[in-house]
């Protein structure tokens, strides 16, 4: 069984929990996910099965879409509601829609972001959250991220008694973007502490929330012997590459990992044979031909 299953992850589950559940439902060990979702976040989590585990990295290269909320007036250790409050600062009056929209627009494009301490980013061989849990501090590397669109989705709510304002947003972003940190950075524009107070992932890996199954849906599909109707071809992970259908002669070369003498069209090409993408080949400027980059060899 090879393919991708877009799962709608429930809140309260880790991404690893979902992988373990899918392994049990499908009775196979070769299962992986393409991008961690925190337990408090729900939404799209593409699950790769069988040979599709070879294309996880390419799924992660697709953009992601989230919707959620930012609350101004306090901050936490984790940049969301799961952490301990470390700073409070009441708002005397709410930000205007003009202020909100101008700042969201200013936070689009190519940005520099410092990942949160409670994250899986590795520094000196250890994950940042391991340092955080041990009470240690470490310099975090700056990373370049891309935010394609960042908009307000409904009127904000101002709680005058608490001195807090909640802003509702939708964001489209590239790989490696921490939405929690976007929330904190939004508050920083106004000299205010902030947290990400809610988040759902609407799209990831080329899949939208409307295409996703719950774990119960997957279990039902198995029981009704219709798994083939819900598992997406691994080709979905390779939509960003130029796909070339190869001849029988070329297939004999490719299936044995040989080089292809083709004029360069793209740096990386996806080779299709017998209706399936069988391999990714990369152009070698020294050899002046295409060489294997990733072998899939789907039957």
From Swiss-Prot:
Origin species, per record, is Pediococcus pentosaceus (strain ATCC 25745 / CCUG 21536 / LMG 10740 / 183-1w)
Checking InterPro entries in the record gives: PsdUridine_synth_cat_dom_sf (IPR020103), PsdUridine_synth_N (IPR002501), tRNA_psdUridine_synth_TruB (IPR014780), TruB_C (IPR032819)
Q: Which transformation does this protein catalyse, written as a reaction?
A: uridine(55) in tRNA = pseudouridine(55) in tRNA
The positions flagged as active site in the entry are: 38 (nucleophile)
Please state what the protein is called: tRNA pseudouridine synthase B
* Record bears the keyword Transmembrane helix: no
Q: Name one GO biological process term.
A: mRNA pseudouridine synthesis
Task of the protein: Responsible for synthesis of pseudouridine from uracil-55 in the psi GC loop of transfer RNAs.
Which family does this protein fall into?
Belongs to the pseudouridine synthase TruB family. Type 1 subfamily.
Query: Which molecular-function annotation in GO is an example for this chain?
Result: RNA binding
Q: What is this protein's gene name? A: truB
């Amino acid at each position: 069984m090879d393919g991708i299953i877009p799962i709608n992850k429930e809140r309260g589950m880790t991404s690893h929990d979902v992988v373990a559940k899918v392994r049990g439902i499908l009775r196979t060990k070769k299962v992986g996910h393409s991008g961690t979702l925190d337990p408090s976040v729900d939404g799209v989590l593409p699950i790769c099965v069988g040979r599709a585990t070879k294309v996880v990295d390419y799924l992660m290269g697709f953009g992601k879409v989230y919707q959620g909320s930012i609350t101004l007036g306090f901050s936490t250790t984790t940049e969301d509601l799961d952490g301990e409050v470390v700073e409070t600062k009441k708002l005397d009056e709410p930000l205007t829609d003009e202020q909100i929209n101008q700042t969201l627009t200013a936070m689009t494009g190519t940005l520099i972001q410092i990942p949160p301490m409670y994250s899986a980013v590795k520094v000196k061989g250890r994950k940042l959250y391991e340092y955080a849990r041990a009470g240690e501090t470490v310099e975090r590397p700056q990373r370049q991220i891309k935010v394609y669109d960042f908009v307000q989705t409904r009127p904000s709510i101002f709680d005058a008694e608490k001195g807090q304002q909640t802003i509702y947003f939708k964001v489209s972003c590239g790989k490696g973007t921490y939405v929690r940190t976007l929330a904190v950075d939004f508050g920083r524009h106004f000299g205010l502490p902030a947290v990400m107070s809610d988040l759902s992932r609407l799209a990831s890996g080329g899949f939208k929330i409307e295409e996703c199954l719950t774990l119960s849906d997957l279990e039902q599909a198995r029981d009704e012997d219709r798994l083939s109707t819900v598992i997406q071809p691994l080709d979905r992970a390779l939509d960003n590459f130029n796909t070339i259908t190869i001849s029988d002669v070329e297939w004999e070369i490719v299936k044995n990992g040989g080089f292809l003498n083709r004029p360069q069209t793209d740096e990386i090409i996806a080779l299709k044979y017998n209706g399936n993408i069988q391999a990714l080949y990369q152009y070698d400027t020294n050899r002046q031909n295409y060489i294997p980059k990733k072998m899939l060899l789907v039957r």
